[in-house]
Amino acid sequence: MGSQSETVCVTGASGFIGSWLVMRLLERRLTVRATVRDPTNVKKVKHLLDLPKAETHLTLWKADLADEGSFDEAIKGCTGVFHVATPMDFESKDPENEVIKPTIEGMLGIMKSCAAAKTVRRLVFTSSAGTVNIQEHQLPVYDESCWSDMEFCRAKKMTAWMYFVSKTLAEQAAWKYAKENNIDFITIIPTLVVGPFIMSSMPPSLITALSPITGNEAHYSIIRQGQFVHLDDLCNAHIYLFENPKAEGRYICSSHDCIILDLAKMLREKYPEYNIPTEFKGVDENLKSVCFSSKKLTDLGFEFKYSLEDMFTGAVDTCRAKGLLRPSHEKPVDGKT
Protein backbone atom coordinates (compact mmCIF):
# COMPACT_ATOMS: atom_id res chain seq x y z
CA MET A 1 0.00 0.00 0.00
CA GLY A 2 0.94 3.65 -0.42
CA SER A 3 2.81 3.68 -3.75
CA GLN A 4 3.38 7.06 -5.39
CA SER A 5 1.07 6.22 -8.32
CA GLU A 6 -1.93 5.77 -6.03
CA THR A 7 -4.97 8.02 -6.02
CA VAL A 8 -6.75 8.60 -2.71
CA CYS A 9 -9.80 10.61 -1.69
CA VAL A 10 -10.02 12.83 1.40
CA THR A 11 -13.47 14.00 2.53
CA GLY A 12 -13.78 17.21 4.52
CA ALA A 13 -10.49 18.26 2.97
CA SER A 14 -10.73 21.97 3.78
CA GLY A 15 -11.05 21.39 7.53
CA PHE A 16 -8.56 21.26 10.40
CA ILE A 17 -7.62 17.58 10.07
CA GLY A 18 -8.47 17.14 6.39
CA SER A 19 -6.26 19.95 5.08
CA TRP A 20 -3.21 18.84 7.09
CA LEU A 21 -3.76 15.25 5.91
CA VAL A 22 -3.94 16.43 2.29
CA MET A 23 -0.63 18.27 2.79
CA ARG A 24 1.07 15.15 4.17
CA LEU A 25 -0.33 12.93 1.38
CA LEU A 26 0.88 15.37 -1.29
CA GLU A 27 4.35 15.34 0.29
CA ARG A 28 4.35 11.58 -0.30
CA ARG A 29 3.50 12.24 -3.97
CA LEU A 30 0.11 10.56 -3.83
CA THR A 31 -2.57 11.94 -6.13
CA VAL A 32 -5.29 13.40 -3.92
CA ARG A 33 -8.94 14.01 -4.70
CA ALA A 34 -10.16 16.44 -2.06
CA THR A 35 -13.90 16.74 -1.50
CA VAL A 36 -15.36 20.02 -0.27
CA ARG A 37 -18.91 21.36 -0.22
CA ASP A 38 -18.10 24.28 -2.52
CA PRO A 39 -14.87 24.18 -4.59
CA THR A 40 -15.63 27.71 -5.90
CA ASN A 41 -15.45 29.26 -2.40
CA VAL A 42 -11.91 30.62 -2.67
CA LYS A 43 -11.70 31.56 1.02
CA LYS A 44 -12.46 27.96 2.04
CA VAL A 45 -10.10 26.21 -0.43
CA LYS A 46 -7.20 28.61 -1.03
CA HIS A 47 -5.06 26.94 1.66
CA LEU A 48 -5.39 23.65 -0.25
CA LEU A 49 -4.59 25.12 -3.68
CA ASP A 50 -1.52 26.87 -2.23
CA LEU A 51 0.01 23.59 -0.97
CA PRO A 52 3.24 22.31 -2.57
CA LYS A 53 2.45 19.80 -5.37
CA ALA A 54 -1.21 20.89 -5.41
CA GLU A 55 -0.95 21.99 -9.03
CA THR A 56 0.09 18.53 -10.21
CA HIS A 57 -1.31 16.14 -7.61
CA LEU A 58 -4.49 17.72 -6.18
CA THR A 59 -8.01 18.08 -7.57
CA LEU A 60 -11.07 19.48 -5.78
CA TRP A 61 -14.43 17.72 -6.00
CA LYS A 62 -17.83 19.02 -4.95
CA ALA A 63 -19.56 16.65 -2.51
CA ASP A 64 -21.86 16.97 0.50
CA LEU A 65 -22.67 14.41 3.20
CA ALA A 66 -26.33 15.41 2.92
CA ASP A 67 -26.41 14.61 -0.82
CA GLU A 68 -26.41 10.83 -1.35
CA GLY A 69 -24.25 9.71 -4.24
CA SER A 70 -22.33 13.00 -4.41
CA PHE A 71 -19.07 11.23 -3.49
CA ASP A 72 -19.39 8.54 -6.19
CA GLU A 73 -17.32 10.32 -8.85
CA ALA A 74 -14.59 11.47 -6.47
CA ILE A 75 -14.13 7.96 -5.04
CA LYS A 76 -14.36 6.06 -8.35
CA GLY A 77 -10.84 4.86 -9.27
CA CYS A 78 -9.34 5.57 -5.83
CA THR A 79 -7.47 2.86 -3.93
CA GLY A 80 -7.93 4.56 -0.56
CA VAL A 81 -10.49 6.83 1.08
CA PHE A 82 -9.97 8.94 4.21
CA HIS A 83 -13.39 9.94 5.54
CA VAL A 84 -12.68 12.97 7.73
CA ALA A 85 -15.75 15.14 7.04
CA THR A 86 -18.32 15.54 9.81
CA PRO A 87 -20.96 18.15 10.75
CA MET A 88 -19.58 20.18 13.68
CA ASP A 89 -22.45 22.53 14.63
CA PHE A 90 -22.46 22.46 18.45
CA GLU A 91 -25.06 25.28 18.56
CA SER A 92 -27.62 23.50 16.37
CA LYS A 93 -31.29 24.08 17.29
CA ASP A 94 -32.25 20.77 15.62
CA PRO A 95 -29.32 18.42 16.34
CA GLU A 96 -31.15 15.22 15.36
CA ASN A 97 -31.73 16.46 11.79
CA GLU A 98 -28.80 18.87 11.39
CA VAL A 99 -25.97 16.86 12.98
CA ILE A 100 -26.85 13.28 13.97
CA LYS A 101 -28.86 12.10 10.96
CA PRO A 102 -26.52 13.66 8.32
CA THR A 103 -23.45 12.14 10.01
CA ILE A 104 -24.89 8.61 9.97
CA GLU A 105 -26.36 8.87 6.46
CA GLY A 106 -23.20 10.54 5.18
CA MET A 107 -21.05 7.73 6.61
CA LEU A 108 -23.17 5.06 4.94
CA GLY A 109 -23.21 7.08 1.71
CA ILE A 110 -19.39 7.09 1.65
CA MET A 111 -19.35 3.33 2.22
CA LYS A 112 -21.82 2.76 -0.62
CA SER A 113 -19.61 4.88 -2.90
CA CYS A 114 -16.58 2.76 -1.89
CA ALA A 115 -18.46 -0.47 -2.57
CA ALA A 116 -19.65 0.79 -5.96
CA ALA A 117 -16.17 1.94 -7.01
CA LYS A 118 -14.71 -1.58 -6.69
CA THR A 119 -11.19 -0.06 -6.57
CA VAL A 120 -11.03 0.98 -2.89
CA ARG A 121 -8.70 -1.26 -0.92
CA ARG A 122 -9.19 0.42 2.42
CA LEU A 123 -11.47 3.04 3.97
CA VAL A 124 -10.07 4.96 6.96
CA PHE A 125 -12.64 6.79 9.10
CA THR A 126 -11.77 9.58 11.53
CA SER A 127 -13.90 8.73 14.55
CA SER A 128 -13.78 10.52 17.92
CA ALA A 129 -12.90 10.00 21.56
CA GLY A 130 -16.54 10.90 22.09
CA THR A 131 -17.42 7.40 20.86
CA VAL A 132 -15.47 5.85 23.74
CA ASN A 133 -15.75 7.51 27.15
CA ILE A 134 -18.94 9.53 27.43
CA GLN A 135 -20.49 7.98 30.52
CA GLU A 136 -21.43 8.92 34.07
CA HIS A 137 -18.24 7.68 35.77
CA GLN A 138 -14.84 7.79 34.07
CA LEU A 139 -12.60 4.71 33.98
CA PRO A 140 -8.86 5.16 34.66
CA VAL A 141 -7.99 3.70 31.23
CA TYR A 142 -9.96 3.37 27.99
CA ASP A 143 -9.19 1.12 25.04
CA GLU A 144 -10.79 0.26 21.69
CA SER A 145 -13.35 -2.11 23.26
CA CYS A 146 -15.11 0.79 25.04
CA TRP A 147 -18.18 2.59 23.69
CA SER A 148 -19.97 5.73 24.96
CA ASP A 149 -23.35 5.56 26.70
CA MET A 150 -25.85 7.12 24.27
CA GLU A 151 -28.68 7.33 26.82
CA PHE A 152 -26.40 9.25 29.21
CA CYS A 153 -25.37 11.59 26.34
CA ARG A 154 -28.94 12.41 25.34
CA ALA A 155 -30.06 12.83 28.97
CA LYS A 156 -27.11 14.97 30.13
CA LYS A 157 -26.86 17.09 26.95
CA MET A 158 -23.34 18.28 27.83
CA THR A 159 -21.36 20.58 25.50
CA ALA A 160 -21.01 18.87 22.07
CA TRP A 161 -23.36 16.01 23.05
CA MET A 162 -24.84 15.84 19.54
CA TYR A 163 -21.34 15.41 18.08
CA PHE A 164 -20.61 12.49 20.45
CA VAL A 165 -23.93 10.80 19.57
CA SER A 166 -23.48 11.36 15.83
CA LYS A 167 -19.95 9.93 15.71
CA THR A 168 -20.85 6.92 17.88
CA LEU A 169 -23.94 5.94 15.90
CA ALA A 170 -22.15 6.58 12.59
CA GLU A 171 -19.20 4.37 13.54
CA GLN A 172 -21.45 1.57 14.79
CA ALA A 173 -23.53 1.71 11.58
CA ALA A 174 -20.31 1.67 9.54
CA TRP A 175 -18.95 -1.44 11.25
CA LYS A 176 -22.21 -3.25 10.51
CA TYR A 177 -22.12 -2.19 6.84
CA ALA A 178 -18.41 -3.04 6.48
CA LYS A 179 -18.94 -6.58 7.78
CA GLU A 180 -22.01 -7.15 5.60
CA ASN A 181 -20.30 -5.81 2.45
CA ASN A 182 -16.74 -7.04 3.03
CA ILE A 183 -15.14 -3.57 3.12
CA ASP A 184 -11.63 -3.20 4.57
CA PHE A 185 -12.48 -0.59 7.18
CA ILE A 186 -10.28 1.08 9.82
CA THR A 187 -11.34 3.66 12.39
CA ILE A 188 -9.00 6.09 14.10
CA ILE A 189 -10.16 7.47 17.45
CA PRO A 190 -8.32 10.73 18.14
CA THR A 191 -8.61 12.50 21.45
CA LEU A 192 -8.58 16.32 21.43
CA VAL A 193 -6.53 17.37 18.40
CA VAL A 194 -4.16 20.28 18.99
CA GLY A 195 -1.35 21.85 16.96
CA PRO A 196 -0.51 24.24 14.13
CA PHE A 197 -2.91 24.32 11.18
CA ILE A 198 -3.34 25.71 7.67
CA MET A 199 -7.08 26.51 7.47
CA SER A 200 -8.04 30.18 7.86
CA SER A 201 -10.65 29.96 10.66
CA MET A 202 -10.48 28.73 14.26
CA PRO A 203 -10.77 24.90 14.38
CA PRO A 204 -13.55 23.69 16.73
CA SER A 205 -11.16 21.49 18.72
CA LEU A 206 -8.93 24.49 19.45
CA ILE A 207 -11.91 26.44 20.80
CA THR A 208 -11.96 23.68 23.44
CA ALA A 209 -8.21 23.20 23.86
CA LEU A 210 -7.48 26.91 24.25
CA SER A 211 -10.49 27.62 26.49
CA PRO A 212 -8.27 28.22 29.57
CA ILE A 213 -6.70 31.07 27.58
CA THR A 214 -9.93 32.47 26.12
CA GLY A 215 -12.06 31.90 29.23
CA ASN A 216 -14.69 29.89 27.36
CA GLU A 217 -16.01 28.09 30.45
CA ALA A 218 -18.55 25.94 28.56
CA HIS A 219 -15.62 23.90 27.22
CA TYR A 220 -13.84 23.28 30.55
CA SER A 221 -15.82 20.07 31.16
CA ILE A 222 -14.32 18.48 28.02
CA ILE A 223 -10.73 19.02 29.21
CA ARG A 224 -11.41 18.55 32.95
CA GLN A 225 -9.70 15.15 32.54
CA GLY A 226 -8.29 15.68 29.07
CA GLN A 227 -6.47 13.61 26.48
CA PHE A 228 -4.61 15.13 23.55
CA VAL A 229 -2.89 14.34 20.26
CA HIS A 230 -0.85 16.53 17.92
CA LEU A 231 -2.49 17.15 14.53
CA ASP A 232 0.63 15.99 12.70
CA ASP A 233 0.86 12.75 14.71
CA LEU A 234 -2.80 12.10 13.94
CA CYS A 235 -2.42 12.64 10.19
CA ASN A 236 0.71 10.50 10.08
CA ALA A 237 -1.27 7.78 11.92
CA HIS A 238 -3.97 7.95 9.23
CA ILE A 239 -1.39 7.30 6.54
CA TYR A 240 0.39 4.63 8.61
CA LEU A 241 -2.84 2.69 9.14
CA PHE A 242 -3.83 3.03 5.49
CA GLU A 243 -0.49 1.63 4.36
CA ASN A 244 0.02 -1.10 6.98
CA PRO A 245 -1.48 -4.39 5.72
CA LYS A 246 -1.72 -5.73 9.30
CA ALA A 247 -3.99 -2.90 10.49
CA GLU A 248 -7.53 -3.89 11.42
CA GLY A 249 -10.38 -2.60 13.57
CA ARG A 250 -10.37 0.48 15.79
CA TYR A 251 -7.25 2.43 16.84
CA ILE A 252 -7.08 5.02 19.60
CA CYS A 253 -4.67 7.82 18.68
CA SER A 254 -3.73 9.77 21.82
CA SER A 255 -0.29 10.70 23.13
CA HIS A 256 -0.92 12.68 26.34
CA ASP A 257 -3.41 13.02 29.17
CA CYS A 258 -3.65 15.55 32.00
CA ILE A 259 -6.23 17.31 34.17
CA ILE A 260 -7.25 20.89 33.43
CA LEU A 261 -5.29 22.21 36.46
CA ASP A 262 -2.00 20.88 35.07
CA LEU A 263 -2.80 22.11 31.56
CA ALA A 264 -3.59 25.59 32.87
CA LYS A 265 -0.34 25.61 34.90
CA MET A 266 1.68 24.73 31.77
CA LEU A 267 -0.11 27.44 29.77
CA ARG A 268 0.37 30.07 32.53
CA GLU A 269 4.11 29.36 32.64
CA LYS A 270 4.37 29.46 28.85
CA TYR A 271 2.04 32.44 28.32
CA PRO A 272 2.08 34.69 31.43
CA GLU A 273 0.55 37.50 29.34
CA TYR A 274 -2.82 35.70 29.34
CA ASN A 275 -5.47 35.68 32.06
CA ILE A 276 -5.42 31.91 32.72
CA PRO A 277 -7.34 30.64 35.78
CA THR A 278 -5.52 29.10 38.73
CA GLU A 279 -8.63 27.32 40.00
CA PHE A 280 -11.50 25.48 38.35
CA LYS A 281 -14.85 24.66 39.95
CA GLY A 282 -14.97 21.09 41.24
CA VAL A 283 -11.33 20.36 40.37
CA ASP A 284 -8.39 19.90 42.74
CA GLU A 285 -4.94 18.31 42.51
CA ASN A 286 -6.35 14.97 43.70
CA LEU A 287 -8.39 14.58 40.50
CA LYS A 288 -6.93 11.65 38.57
CA SER A 289 -6.17 11.89 34.87
CA VAL A 290 -7.95 9.54 32.46
CA CYS A 291 -5.85 7.65 29.91
CA PHE A 292 -6.80 6.69 26.37
CA SER A 293 -4.44 3.82 25.60
CA SER A 294 -2.74 3.92 22.19
CA LYS A 295 -1.04 0.58 22.89
CA LYS A 296 -2.72 -1.13 19.93
CA LEU A 297 -1.38 1.59 17.59
CA THR A 298 2.15 1.69 19.02
CA ASP A 299 2.33 -2.13 19.13
CA LEU A 300 1.78 -2.00 15.36
CA GLY A 301 4.93 0.14 15.13
CA PHE A 302 3.61 3.71 15.06
CA GLU A 303 5.64 6.32 16.97
CA PHE A 304 4.35 9.64 18.35
CA LYS A 305 6.72 12.59 17.76
CA TYR A 306 5.30 15.53 19.69
CA SER A 307 5.03 16.71 23.31
CA LEU A 308 2.03 18.39 24.93
CA GLU A 309 3.94 21.67 24.89
CA ASP A 310 4.62 21.24 21.14
CA MET A 311 0.88 20.91 20.51
CA PHE A 312 -0.12 24.04 22.39
CA THR A 313 2.81 26.17 21.20
CA GLY A 314 1.95 25.28 17.60
CA ALA A 315 -1.72 26.05 18.15
CA VAL A 316 -1.19 29.37 19.94
CA ASP A 317 1.48 30.57 17.49
CA THR A 318 -0.75 29.76 14.50
CA CYS A 319 -3.82 31.39 16.06
CA ARG A 320 -1.83 34.55 16.80
CA ALA A 321 -0.34 34.64 13.29
CA LYS A 322 -3.82 34.33 11.76
CA GLY A 323 -5.34 36.95 14.08
CA LEU A 324 -7.59 34.38 15.78
CA LEU A 325 -6.19 34.92 19.28
CA ARG A 326 -5.32 38.21 20.94
CA PRO A 327 -1.65 38.53 21.91
CA SER A 328 -2.48 39.14 25.59
CA HIS A 329 -5.18 39.76 28.22
CA GLU A 330 -5.29 42.10 31.15
CA LYS A 331 -4.71 40.25 34.41
CA PRO A 332 -7.87 39.40 36.39
CA VAL A 333 -8.33 40.59 39.96
CA ASP A 334 -8.16 37.13 41.54
CA GLY A 335 -7.09 34.73 38.76
CA LYS A 336 -10.09 32.48 39.39
CA THR A 337 -13.14 31.42 37.39
From Swiss-Prot:
Q: Which CDD domains match?
A: AR_like_SDR_e
> At which positions is substrate bound?
S128, N133, Y163, P204, T208, Q227
Q: Which residues cross the membrane?
A: none
Entry's EC annotation:
1.1.1.219, 1.1.1.234
Reactions catalysed, as given in the entry: a (2R,3S,4S)-leucoanthocyanidin + NADP(+) = a (2R,3R)-dihydroflavonol + NADPH + H(+); (2S)-flavan-4-ol + NADP(+) = (2S)-flavanone + NADPH + H(+)
InterPro entries membership: Epimerase_deHydtase, NAD(P)-bd_dom_sf, NAD(P)_dehydrat-like
A Gene Ontology molecular function term for this protein is: flavanone 4-reductase activity
Q: From the UniProt record, give the pathway where this protein acts.
A: Pigment biosynthesis; anthocyanin biosynthesis
Known SUPFAM superfamilies for this protein? NAD(P)-binding Rossmann-fold domains (SSF51735)
Q: Which Gene3D superfamilies match?
A: NAD(P)-binding Rossmann-like Domain
Similarity annotation: Belongs to the NAD(P)-dependent epimerase/dehydratase family. Dihydroflavonol-4-reductase subfamily.
Please give the name of this protein.
Dihydroflavonol 4-reductase
- Recorded name of the encoding gene: DFR
